[in-house]
Amino acid sequence: CLDNNHDINIVGTHLENDFIEKLKKNKNIHPGLNTEIPDQIKIFKFEKFDELLNSNIDLIVLGISSKGIEWVADQLSRLFKGKNLPNLLMLTKGLSIHKNNYELLVDKLERLLVDKGIAKTNISAVGGPCLAAGLANKVHSSVVIANKDINTAKKIANMLNTNYYHTSYSDDLNGVEV
């Protein structure tokens, strides 16, 4: 996104405040990726979550653990109940069990948001392979952006596509997730 002139804000969860402080003290060198995060990418502690999500945003990218799905559903529903929820792009893969059936995590998030009063959700997913270290170092990779609505998938794919991060799109959300 940065290479396509989009503003990027990264907001950590409440569990990542110490990590964010260390990152900033270390001149934005990410310890796990061993690469510098560009100054144009703004990194915030969770205390800025509400303020940033209430600004004019086109896309919320969710890079949370599978155990954090309920938490993020709580946070999003708290802010967007009765409002339009921006497009979501979920990086998290996996399955959950609901009423003795397997459910994709994108479906779980949608169910939780609807249960919490978000009438309209628009959740996309990305299928790789693409590793964070490769992306941070601009290693060529190819991904598929999937959404039940092909136009949304195409819009997000075009937003993210660069000369090293190659995107295609699909309306087969379940197929890309599995």
Regions flagged by a language model, labelled:
Residues N5-I57, E70, D74, R78-L79:
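Conserved N-terminal Rossmann-fold NAD(P) cofactor-binding segment
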